[in-house]
Amino acid sequence: MNQTKNSGPKKYFNRYVALLAMAGDPAFTSFLEEARPQVVQMGFYGPQLYAFGDTELGSGYPMSLPVRGVHEVLDWQKQFNQQIHDIGGKVIGHFSMTIAWGDPEKNTGFFESYNGDSWHTELLGPKPVDQIDDLVHKQPDGQMIVGDRYGFPWVAGCSNNPNWRKLHRKMVEVAIIRCDVDGFVSLYNYNHGCACDYCNQAFRAYLLDRYSPKEINSKFDIDNLDSFRLDGTLGKSPGWIDPDSPHPVGLQIEAMRFSQSSWKQHYDEIFIKTGRKLKPDLILGSWNHLGFMKHHERNVMPKEMWGCDEDLLWYSTGAGTGTVANGDAGVRMLNLKFIWELSGHKLPVLGRYEGTRTRASIAEGLACQGPGMGLYCNWKDPDGRKAFIDYFHFAEEFQSYYHPVESYAEVALVFPRQAILKGNDQPVEHFRKIGQFLMDAHILFDVLSDQNISVERLDQYRGIVLTDTNSLGERQAELLAEYANQKNPVIVPLDSEGAPNFIDQLTAHEKVFLVALGDRAKLVSVLRDEIYGGVSTFDTMWTVRINAYFQTERVVIHFVNYNRIESKDNGPANESPIAISDVGVNLRLKDSNKKITEVTFLSPEIPYRENLTWNQDSDRLHFQIRSMLVYGVVVIDIAP
């Protein structure tokens, strides 16, 4: 069931190139002409540009500006954007929400620009305040918070500071009007524990809007809200509970939620209200950090804000890639499923901090309704270049099989967001492990947030796997019991100590199964044996990840093979995939009265295309894939 979290239509694209450091080489444009991406992410339009654009520092990483001078960079980006428009693509640029590079002691970067004679009034108007320290994150004593990244000192603008937002609005206007950029990806969506007056005033108002003074006292141990001040530890984002903090867990959670809500309000003001007023079809994304299902910049954000009116949800996975030898192949596909669910089925992107598994990285994005390969496009490397061109041409040729689609998943794995909102992140570890089990066993599953449990959503699936019961509401437990009454299995963790009493009524049901976290065999056997009519099965290596989608009169199944010869050598030439063969498929059809007319295997690699031999037995379809290297798509056509 397609979800909606937009005031307008959702955008879709899956041919996407992203570079953080800019590529000024004309050969890059030639590569793009050949690869034909729909969207290119490159360029800087926020505080970074105005901090380093007029200095030699801008030529180094991470910006690698191709020319020097703010006006010169804007002109270069305008020309580049036009070149991409000419070949049918769009360009989205980077925009820092907080960090502005510069050393306050040496008066470099943003400080040199703001404090000196080089402030670009002709672009940004008069300075909104006299001093930078009236724009940025502050310590409780009023001093600026100063950090370091890429060897550069930085300060961070405050999302609750109206003057910082005003400056950002002007930067967005310049980017759109001057450079004709097609969208933005926000960077550094952080709160470093700001305790400025704006944050204190906004946080007090935030609490009063949600709680009575009596509740504020009893829940958060705040006697006098008027005199309460943030202490530099509260509200950090990304962040999590500090068990040694003197503050109650509830206050720590509320402070993080406040920070993340403030960031979203800041984001909406500059990009949606300002940016989309100038360009209604502006493509909007945000670059956040998830690792493997860890705490991130939206971990306690209100549900209704999560990805609202955004198009692209980028989450970096970190540099850890996992190894086949250690039983880790493509586990971060679980991240993509999580993002797709929490965002309301927006475009999920993984920022992979490695440039070796180019084909697998593109393929996993394509297989999860997103654009692949969020970082490190090795366009100068012959193997990397070929991978992008081959896969993009494949996605372009068979675009109709990618979008629009509905999920064909048979099982839902419930993400325990309500537990997180109560300060308990232990169930997330359960979610990670069970998610890996299900992927290894080739169970067709979606992620379902516990906040989205409803009759409509439950009815999409033949089985439900819970990772936490302690934070379920009574109505949710009733819905799950009604679901089990329809002979659908519900799996719950064996250790449910501390769960509300009404959970006992749920677990007493004959179709509710208590399974220990580490009992992988029982988990899979319950799904295969207790789901009426069984589940689809796939006879292939555990290193293959499988997703399936439904279109009108068609089922589309994606296969991504992560198996490879692993070595210490990097680069696309060392991806070294190991082909799989004789993949047996036993697909359960949703309607046994429908007749299959054709089954076709497609791939950007040999054998490219094969018409498969198949056999339909009532609601079961049997076929075999002879061979596949990294990525393959099976298209099953159904008679009307």
Q: Which ranges hold each PLM region?
A:
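Boundary/entry segment of secreted carbohydrate-active catalytic domains
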Residues: 2-31, 43
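Aromatic- and glycine-enriched glycan-recognition loops and surfaces
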Residues: 18-34, 58-89, 165-168, 265-269
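A cross-domain feature marking catalytic cores of carbohydrate-active enzymes
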Residues: 19-22, 42-44, 51, 93-97, ...
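Acidic (Asp/Glu)-rich catalytic clusters
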Residues: 30-36, 81-88, 303-308, 339-343, ...
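Polysaccharide-binding and catalytic clefts of secreted carbohydrate-active enzymes
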Residues: 31, 98, 107-109, 116-329
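Aromatic-lined carbohydrate-binding/catalytic grooves of carbohydrate-active enzymes
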Residues: 33-76, 99-109, 192-202, 300-301, ...
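Active-site mouth loops of central-metabolism enzymes
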Residues: 13-25, 153-167, 352-353
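Carbohydrate-binding surfaces of carbohydrate-active enzymes
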Residues: 245, 265-269, 273-295, 306-640
